[in-house]
């Protein structure tokens, strides 16, 4: 009898030793709960860590926005994102839009390396490990077009002249790839570029008759446009093949008008053009005499295509920020300025004569050949610049004061709008008062938005630099805590701090022209 009971007793002991709730069929704490039905808001799937897997299985093309409820950029994107979903649904496109609350779904945010909001990722065919980063615009049509070119063909297949002419006639910018073999790897390069060049429409053909009708004998990418020259050809190198970077630069350069007016609609494309030299003609377009200058400006432009971008700035429009950047008043128009975006150096005509095609051409050649010195912005020296504890420096007196070999000069480079600068202002004033009786120490400040220096450029605010007495034009950048005690310790130690001092405080970046990315600003975590 005891032998018969032994297996039963062993079974009871095993059950008793299991953790509570681990009976057969129970779920361990580490297991995922069963997948839920995925809710929707305004046509957008609302995902969690429990439903992402289901969404990936059910939707072969899935764009997911990682957002934060407090993020202003996310709030601005939300209505456009919903509109894009509605547009694509109306077209019966096989693509789905979804969103994830990043702070609430921290595991997902960490899994996909989300460090700023909004971040959008595109998943294909359920592949969870290698999503594509979204790099397109933030408006509804831009989002929709970015997705169309990924779930559908990025270029239209053209079989005859009627189809080609219909495509060319229907858009301002049309790019057609003429390839004798559509299986060639150059075609894959062409289609890859077509996915992201959303401001152009792309076509593709291998028809010999179309080669003949457009005067081509070998593989060529042709840009058709309804302005300027009307057409620009990019022959494919028979030995090296089609280079994505070279083709991209060609299309960006030749898709720009020879003369572009600066405004809110064109500014992003101007800065994304990858042409470093920009020649700006400042005119008042309400005046007939100024408008007459545009013809000569346009006449000079073709010979500098790809080297210099010709831009018209209307001083009668909302362009005060452009005038300020060049240190100009509206009354200075008509006038020319050239800026190199890489070095930020600015140039002005030396003679200041009339603006003609000849004078514009000569000015451009002189700058490109290094025959014109750049000019630096500077405010006028205030009469009382040295009367307060904090001395006021401008471009015109900076060198004389900062590199005085008999003085130790501590300078704050600031921007009037900078919050960090305003927060540290009381400490800087207190520092100046503390050391105002030290004849060999000067505490100063310089508005770096209105004054430029030949010695170095300022890239963030506030930037603090110490210029010790003595020869050699030595410069020490201060990167520690911005308070009176630490400032004083720094000065008393001759421009050095003990190693235990806390790390540097952040600086607000100097405003830059819009970058090539079309996603715009994001908010970091």
Swiss-Prot record:
- The EC code for this enzyme is 5.3.4.1
Q: Which organism is it from?
A: Homo sapiens
Would you tell me the protein name for this molecule? Protein disulfide-isomerase A2
Key word Signal present: yes
Q: Where in the cell is it found?
A: Endoplasmic reticulum lumen
Q: Kindly identify the residues recorded as the active site.
A: 71, 74, 418, 421
Q: Check the record and name the NCBIfam families matching this protein.
A: ER_PDI_fam
Composition bias, Pro residues: 505-514
Q: Which family does it belong to?
A: Belongs to the protein disulfide isomerase family.
Q: Which CDD domains match?
A: PDI_a_family, PDI_a_PDI_a'_C, PDI_b'_family, PDI_b_family
- One Gene Ontology CC term in the entry: endoplasmic reticulum
Designated gene of the protein: PDIA2
Instruction: Cite the record's note on assembly.
Output: Monomer; predominantly as monomer under reducing conditions. Homodimer; disulfide-linked. Part of a large chaperone multiprotein complex comprising DNAJB11, HSP90B1, HSPA5, HYOU, PDIA2, PDIA4, PDIA6, PPIB, SDF2L1, UGGT1 and very small amounts of ERP29, but not, or at very low levels, CALR nor CANX.
Instruction: Give GO MF terms, alphabetically.
Output: disulfide oxidoreductase activity; protein disulfide isomerase activity; protein-disulfide reductase activity; steroid binding
User: What keywords are annotated for this sequence in UniProt?
Assistant: Chaperone, Disulfide bond, Endoplasmic reticulum, Glycoprotein, Isomerase, Lipid-binding, Redox-active center, Repeat, Signal, Steroid-binding
Q: What class of enzyme is it?
A: isomerase
- Where does the entry annotate site (Lowers pKa of C-terminal Cys of second active site)? 482
Q: Which residues does the annotation list for site: Lowers pKa of C-terminal Cys of first active site?
A: 138
Q: List the disulfide bonds.
A: 71-74, 418-421
Q: Where is this motif: Prevents secretion from ER?
A: 522-525
**Which GO biological process categories is it annotated with?**
platelet aggregation; protein folding; protein folding in endoplasmic reticulum; protein retention in ER lumen; response to endoplasmic reticulum stress
**Where is composition skewed (Polar residues) in this entry?**
516-525
Catalytic activity of the protein: Catalyzes the rearrangement of -S-S- bonds in proteins
């Amino acid at each position: 009898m005891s032998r018969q009971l032994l297996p039963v007793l062993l079974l009871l002991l095993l059950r008793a030793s299991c953790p509570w709730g681990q009976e057969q069929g129970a779920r361990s704490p580490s297991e995922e709960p069963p997948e839920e039905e995925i809710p929707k808001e305004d046509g957008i799937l609302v995902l969690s860590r429990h439903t992402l897997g289901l969404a990936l299985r059910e939707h072969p093309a899935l764009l997911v926005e990682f957002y934060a409820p407090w993020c202003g950029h996310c709030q601005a994107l939300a209505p456009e994102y919903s509109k894009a979903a509605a547009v694509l649904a109306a077209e019966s496109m096989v693509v789905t839009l979804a969103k994830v609350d990043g702070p609430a779904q921290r595991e997902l945010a960490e899994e996909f390396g989300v460090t700023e909001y909004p971040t959008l990722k595109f998943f294909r065919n359920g592949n969870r490990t290698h999503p594509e980063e979204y790099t397109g615009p933030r408006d509804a049509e831009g989002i929709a077009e970015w997705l169309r070119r990924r779930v559908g063909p990025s270029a239209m297949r053209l079989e005859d002249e009627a189809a080609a002419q219909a495509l060319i006639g229907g858009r301002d910018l049309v790019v057609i790839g003429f390839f004798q073999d559509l299986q060639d790897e150059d075609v894959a390069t062409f289609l890859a570029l077509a996915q992201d060049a959303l401001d152009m429409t792309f076509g593709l053909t291998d028809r010999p008759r179309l080669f003949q009708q457009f005067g081509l004998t070998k593989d060529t990418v042709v840009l058709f446009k309804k302005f300027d020259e009307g057409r620009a050809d990019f022959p494919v190198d028979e030995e090296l093949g089609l280079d994505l970077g070279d083709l991209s630069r060609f299309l960006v350069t030749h898709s720009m008008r020879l003369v572009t007016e600066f405004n809110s609609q064109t500014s992003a494309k101007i800065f994304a053009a990858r042409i470093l030299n920009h020649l700006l003609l400042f005119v008042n377009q309400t005046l007939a005499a100024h408008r007459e200058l545009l013809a000569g400006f346009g006449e000079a432009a073709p010979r500098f295509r790809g080297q210099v971008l010709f831009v018209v700035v209307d001083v009668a429009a909302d362009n005060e920020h452009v005038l300020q950047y060049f240190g100009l008043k509206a009354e200075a128009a008509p006038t020319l300025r050239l800026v190199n975006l890489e070095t930020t150096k600015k140039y002005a005509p030396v003679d200041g004569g009339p603006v003609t095609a000849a004078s514009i051409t000569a000015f451009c050649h002189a700058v490109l050949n290094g025959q014109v010195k750049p000019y630096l912005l500077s405010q006028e020296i205030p009469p009382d610049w040295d009367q307060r504890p904090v001395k006021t420096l401008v471009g015109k007196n900076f060198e004389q004061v900062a590199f005085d070999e008999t003085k130790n000069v501590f300078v704050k480079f600031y921007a009037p709008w900078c919050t960090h600068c305003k927060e540290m202002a009381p400490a800087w004033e207190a520092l100046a008062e503390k050391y105002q009786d030290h004849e060999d120490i000067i505490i100063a400040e310089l508005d770096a938005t209105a004054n430029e220096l030949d010695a170095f450029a300022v890239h963030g605010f506030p930037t603090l630099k110490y210029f010790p007495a003595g020869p050699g034009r030595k410069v020490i950048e201060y990167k520690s805590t911005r308070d009176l005690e630490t400032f004083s310790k720094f000065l008393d130690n001759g421009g050095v701090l003990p190693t235990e001092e806390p790390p540097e405080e952040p600086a607000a970046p100097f405003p830059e022209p819009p970058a090539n990315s079309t996603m715009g600003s994001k908010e970091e975590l």
